[in-house]
Amino acid sequence: MVKKIKKAETTRRRFISGFSLLSAGIILRPLSLFSQEENQVLNIGSPANFLSDKLISNFQKVVSSSINSITYNSNSNINFNNNNYDVLIGRDSYLEGLIDDGKIAELNKDLIPNNSFIDPKFTNSAFDKDRKHTIPLSYGAIGIAYRKSKFSEPPSTWRWLLDSDKYAGKIALLGDGRTLIQIALKYMGVSLNTNDPMWINQAEKLLKRQKVNIKDFGKKNGIELLINGEVDLAIVSNENFKNINDNDIGFTFPREGSLIWQDCACIPKSSIKVEESHSIINSMLDPKNSKSIAENLQTATPNIMALDISKKSYKENTTIFPNAQIIERYEDTSTILDFDYEMMIEEMWDNILDS
């Protein structure tokens, strides 16, 4: 979906000077005007519902170009090469691929003074070393969804899903072998980004032992299985949990830690509006704008000043925010690793499924 916000005065002037009437009765624009008009438009790409019309209007105040808002529903719909993005908001796993391909520019942090509002925990990342290319706007985490009536207290440990037969036949795991192995690594007390074969072999053994107790390995949606009463425990992202309307289903962050995902802003190298693009990102980090994004999405904000002025109900939502001790054990991850590691994970996952 494309939304355009243009200054009426400028548009009228273009209309008067840029169009000519030909003898055939067809109105055409000179070729030079196409280039001129493109140069006066700044394209922002974002997930659907990420940026409200009001926010786009706020951004318009800090640039002279007309803003063209392009939204997408999934990474496969971004169409990076054809949309001439000046600012792009995307999930970390997708942006890492663009960074690796050399398509994302390094940011000039001097042009983004509001970057000082970002929690220091996010100043580095596994997918963007030294945070040279991206600015985090929103984040969430993988945790445990459970049926409350089956538990006397929240099952806040991976043990019940990965290392116990107490809930045999009532557990839904992920169908993503790499993420599941990373979660097993966190349960064992090591970094989910380790590539040490010894630890990864231990994770494989753990999952093989537990397989007999698992109802589903990602073939079905874990939340749907919970709602239908087929399982009592499932691995889900808190982003997906927020739309559940069943009061008997809860969400908890495991104390061992887990995986964090981030939605970030960046500037493609193809942008010719570098300064204005930096101004847009800086405006996104304005506390009021950042607060609006976070409360609208009901996902966590890494912006300390935005959190400070947010509603109490948002700040105290335990589905959005883990407590301070647990969040320290959460990690982001890189999806681009060496070939040997990828082959090892793929082979181990096949072994787990075939066991």
What spans do the regions from the language model cover?
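N-terminal secretory signal peptides
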Residues: 1-10, 24
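Early extracytoplasmic/lumenal segment of secretory-pathway proteins
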Residues: 35-97
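Periplasmic-binding protein-like
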Residues: 55, 117, 140, 169-178, 200-209, 245-269, 283-308
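C-terminal capping/gating helix-and-loop segments adjacent to ligand/active sites or protein-protein/ligand interfaces
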Residues: 71, 291-355
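Extracytoplasmic ligand-binding site segments that recognize negatively charged/polar headgroups
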Residues: 92-213, 218-227
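A ligand-binding cleft/hinge motif common to bilobed small-molecule-binding domains
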Residues: 94-99, 227-228, 233-248
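A bilobed periplasmic-binding-protein/Venus flytrap-type ligand-binding module shared by bacterial periplasmic
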Residues: 143-150, 186-187, 262-277, 281-283, ...
